[in-house]
């Protein structure tokens, strides 16, 4: 279901190194890669994420980033949110927070900005993925998805969408392989754009508004410190669910993390 092809690497000679030194460096890199192969069958997702930080730092030291195999269709992980400083830290931007956290956990990607979407091509636990943050408002997220689908020749089966959910308590995570929009206008826009409900979605709870606070005011306001801690824990859990979905399939991830 998901792209499992390993990312290829574009070789670039580090300044100041002889040919023999470069051979030694690349031998060390290959040894680290072999360790990752061993870990990938035994380690928990957070262990693989720690390894990825080392690998990403090594890639930057060598002056080269992980790149997608041009012939492979990557898994596209889209986090929903509103662009601009005005909306930073608001509940409706939980999807953005998750994408940023994945990028921090798996450094060394190739980042680009387009008219409708920011993207970063990453190697996440041995899988080629595109992390995406739409530059449209949440209610128009489908436009960004259409752009991504065209650029990467992707279909709904290559898509994972991460977004906020009022129907869940703060930090609660739910992963599904398909479903309706649940009243979320961003999801409604995406379903209309791709023409199907058959794609993976991960919801992170932000809780319902209290008192006289309306839904719109709630999602566009910032959570309390206690809520933020719960949401951050939910984001970590969502990332572990994504890694498991990539490595073992979405059904396995649903059984473990729902």
Task: Describe each region flagged by the PLM.
Residues 225-226:
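A hydrophobic, small-residue-rich beta->alpha segment in the mid-to-C-terminal subdomain
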Residues 48-178, 187-203, 209-214, 229-236, ...:
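Nucleotide and nucleotide-moiety/phosphate-recognizing core
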Residues 24-34:
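Short, composition-biased linear "edge" segments at structural boundaries
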């Amino acid at each position: 279901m998901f792209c499992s092809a390993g990312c290829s690497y574009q070789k670039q000679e580090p300044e100041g190194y002889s040919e023999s030194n470069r051979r030694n460096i690349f031998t060390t890199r290959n040894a680290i890669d072999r360790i990752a192969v061993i870990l990938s069958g035994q380690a928990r997702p957070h262990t693989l994420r720690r390894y990825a930080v080392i690998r990403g730092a090594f890639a930057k030291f060598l002056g080269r980033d992980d790149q997608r195999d041009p012939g492979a269709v990557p898994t596209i992980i889209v986090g929903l949110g509103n662009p601009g400083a005005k909306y930073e830290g608001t509940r409706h931007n939980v999807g953005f927070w998750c994408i940023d956290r994945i990028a921090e956990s798996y450094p060394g990607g190739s980042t680009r900005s387009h008219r409708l979407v920011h993207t970063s091509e990453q190697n996440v636990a041995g899988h080629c993925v595109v992390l995406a943050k739409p530059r449209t408002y949440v209610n128009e997220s489908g436009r960004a998805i259409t752009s991504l689908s065209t650029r990467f020749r992707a279909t709904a089966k290559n898509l994972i969408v991460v977004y906020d959910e009022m129907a869940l308590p703060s930090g609660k995570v739910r992963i599904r392989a398909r479903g309706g929009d649940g009243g979320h206008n961003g999801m409604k826009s995406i379903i209309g754009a791709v023409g199907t409900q058959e794609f993976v979605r991960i919801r992170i709870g932000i809780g319902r508004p209290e008192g006289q606070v309306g839904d719109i005011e709630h999602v566009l306001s910032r959570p309390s410190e206690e809520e933020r801690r719960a949401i951050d824990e939910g984001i970590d859990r969502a990332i572990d669910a994504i890694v498991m979905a990539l490595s073992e399939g979405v059904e396995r991830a649903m059984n473990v993390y729902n």
